[in-house]
Amino acid sequence: MNTPLRRVSIAVMVMVVALLANATYLQVIKADDLRSDPRNSRVLLDEYSRQRGQISAGGQVLAASISTDDRYKYLRTYPPNQLAPNSPMANAPVTGFYSMLYSSTGLERTEDQVLNGSDDRLFGRRLFDLISGRDPRGGNVVTTIDPVVQQVAYDQLFSRGYTGAVVAIEPSTGRVLAMASSPSYDPNLLASHDGAQTSEAWDQLNSDPDKPLLNRAISATYPPGSTFKVLVTAAALENGASPDDQLTAASTITLPDTETSLENYNGSTCGGGATASLREAFARSCNTAFVELGINTGADALRDTASAFGIGEETTSLPLPVADSTIGSIPDDAALGQSSIGQRDVALTPLQDAVIAATVANGGVRMAPHMVSQLQSPDLSNLSTTAPDSRGQAISAETAATLTSLMIGSENNTGGEGKIAGVQIASKTGTAEHGTDPRNTPPHAWYIGFAPAEDPKIAIAVIVEDGGDRALAATGGSVAAPVGRAVIAAGLQGR
């Protein structure tokens, strides 16, 4: 071969290699990025040419796809309940949204392969649709959510103008009955095929200082305040303490090796004597007594008990992503004293606090929380069913029974609206300081509990940020307890 021809051959070969390399790069290495690029209209057209499956709860459709006349064959919708026009907002923390421009969140994201029909378990269905010429359809997601409890949980927050969250769990199974967050948003606005409308809604939601897109039930952590005393008491009881043990009743206590003092609510003493029993200190939620109790119990026991309740453990069962809860570092007894009243670096999601209540209610057995009951094929045949998943005996049945008794005492000592006639609730309130100037910042108000105390059917956690409508005067009993009791009342209907 002469030199010019050789050069031409080499040039052609180099171009072929470059073409193959570029094709490989685009089709293999960059394939996922290109598929997920919202500007890729071919991907959008393909996704919207299939009827996406439904998300449902208690027989009610929370999300569905309807046919349209535009180039995108199906529109994702979140239909309102006839009795609750704001139900799409109530359900948004569960469903999330499915958007042409902004991807997806919630179950729309975590169960996307089932909903869009690409799940491996639906291969036979896809093949049948291809051979028969039928339009492809996605599978369905059946949730554990009780739509009545979910709506009540959201309405209790929304109607009062509260920013916060509610989680309700069935103690014996871990089924999540409600997961509400307020303020919320209408996912229909982000599912629109009108790009301008979707962009405007997105900008408004993201610029809102109240963060309506944030699922506060699982994506935010808060100091739990006195609700953490349930866990501290569990640690103490598991390590030999008794409800009759005497603790300081002083109005203030100085943390070891510091000049920092902590005080009881309103600077009051814990009863009329120099000491108070653990039972009385729990009912009155005395900070000084619990600083002493926590230090006497020890940091290792507190860490072990926190771990047994699932704190620090990744939550994969939901199946939504959940922020990590933590008790923080405890380098010395001063830190231990602060942590023992649910302050310092202790930070829990509302879901985690609900799990603590549910574990006590379930005789000390911790069940993994889950929100998907069943995955179905398009013809409603079963793909998988979520079975209750025990994560072990967090505390003994005896300790759980003692805690239940103490929580009954706390409920009976707590004011606020909404007490349910004929139903004994076991509960614990919390009023948690936060921020750089906690004494002048409205506290977060907490309420965790379960009912009926003698045969628990529902366990709940309520967080109301920044004192709700009570500002600096807020307490868990006055602000969060009425919300929690209303949710419990709804959850007990038919159970």
Question: Where would I find each of the regions flagged by the language model?
Answer:
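Periplasmic/cell-envelope proteins involved in peptidoglycan metabolism and beta-lactam response
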Residues: 1-197, 221-223, 300-308, 420, ...
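Beta-lactam-recognizing serine transpeptidase/beta-lactamase-like catalytic domain environment
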Residues: 176-226, 231-467, 476
